[in-house]
Amino acid sequence: EINNTYACGSNAIQSHRIHKDRPNNIIVLDAVADEINNSILRAGHVTFGLSASLNGSGTAIDFNWLKENIRKLSDEDDEKTIESLLLRERIYVEYLNQTRVYALKDGGKKRFYAQRNSWIKAQYYSLFTNIGNLPHAIFSGNFDYADRILQWFIFPRTILLGIILLFGTIMVFFDWVACVKWWLLLFCLLFTMALAIPNYLVDDKFNKAMKAIPVMAAGKIVNFLFGKKKK
């Protein structure tokens, strides 16, 4: 299917990555996060005519283009650098939902927090290196590129949920009328995420992993704020 899509003129293709096994809570939540991204940032974007987001694996890119641009890749995050280079040139990233790539991941806590910390830093590195191009992308009609830059403004989901919950709780004691909008925003975000999770992931493992989210979210925030970056 990838070859057929390439033959039809697509120079950048993202397949559907799925976790092969879910042995612990970390891998279960990682699988859920992947599928939420697949539903919103890939399948959803393509449905509305926007370019799909790259996933870091299961990606096929035209070899000649990659050969010309390989030296431009950043040490911070190759995936987002490739994505920004593609979108600057208005190269559309196609998403193949039915073409599945099965992945195995290390589920250790140290690796989990280190990886999330690295992703967050890479996101804002990409934002700061591309934000200057946002006005030109908008006014030149390069909406795929503009959309991706705006995405990098948004906090990661775990941190975003924590911020909304914190403000909602604080406002209860100061202005209960104003706090309604925060709880409504939290409900809308959770509802959107729930819709994006496929049925095959909702099982006993999922229910068990949901109970571990508060502890993991707190650890993620602490690690991001105080964790030392490995050289």
Where are these regions (language model features)?
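Membrane-embedded multi-pass helical conduit in multi-pass membrane proteins
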Residues: 151-230
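Long helical/loop segments within the catalytic core of UDP-sugar-dependent glycosyltransferases
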Residues: 3-75, 124
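Hydrophobic, membrane-facing alpha-helical anchors
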Residues: 130-142, 171-175
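Nucleotide-sugar-dependent glycosyltransferase catalytic core
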Residues: 104-121, 205-208
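Acidic donor-binding loop at a coil-to-helix junction in glycosyltransferase catalytic cores
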Residues: 75-82
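Catalytic donor-sugar/metal-binding loop of nucleotide-sugar-dependent glycosyltransferases
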Residues: 83-102
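Catalytic core of nucleotide-sugar-dependent glycosyltransferases
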Residues: 33-40, 113-134, 163, 216-227
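Loop-to-transmembrane boundary segments
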Residues: 138-158
